[in-house]
Each structure stands twice: as C-alpha cells, then as structure tokens.
Amino acid sequence: MVCVPCFIIPLLLYIWHKFVQPIILRYWNPWEKKDAQGNVIKKGPDFPFECKGGVCPFVPGAKKPEKASVGPAEESQNPPLNAIAAETEVDESKKEI
C-alpha cells in the first residue's frame, strides 16, 4: 500500500501546476517582462535573423576563411593523426609477436 504523503503530494502538485497556478499568474506574475516605466511588455522581441535593408548578416553556407598554406617543414612537425594511429598499430602488432 502507498503511504498517504506519497500519493497526496504529487496529486496536489499536479492540480497546482495545471489549474491553480495559471489563474494566479494572470493577476500576479513577478516574472513578467517590464520596461523602464514598469509597464508589462506584451509583444516579444523581433526575429533577430531578418534581412533589413537588403543586407543579411547571417547567410547560410557562407564561405569560411581558409587557413594559410602549410609548408613541408610544418607538416613534418605535426604529422597527420592517421599516420600516428597507423604507427601505434604497427608497434602493438610487433609487441604481440
């Protein structure tokens, strides 16, 4: 059998969140957005990704800046990860034999 608080508390919380809280928040809502004069803001902010004046700052698929070309001296200092992984696999196979 379930104890009384284990049954009553979730039931009261459900009733509070579904029915009582929305009614109370209509008349007293401390989390409402207000402007500097204390008036409630009814309208939300504009969509920030609109193109205004024929210029759109957020173009999908825009080109990313390319890195400077890497010379052969820099490649030897930083070998690709695949080469490192291949070398470790070869070393491990030699250890097993």
From Swiss-Prot:
Annotated stretches, region: Disordered: 64-97
Keyword Phosphoprotein applies: yes
Source organism, top-level taxon: Eukaryota
The keyword Phosphoprotein is assigned to this record: yes
Keywords associated with the record: Phosphoprotein
Annotated positions of the Phosphoserine modification: 69
Pfam families in UniProt: DUF4512
Family stated for the protein in its record: Belongs to the UPF0729 family.
Protein name as it appears in the record: UPF0729 protein GD16342
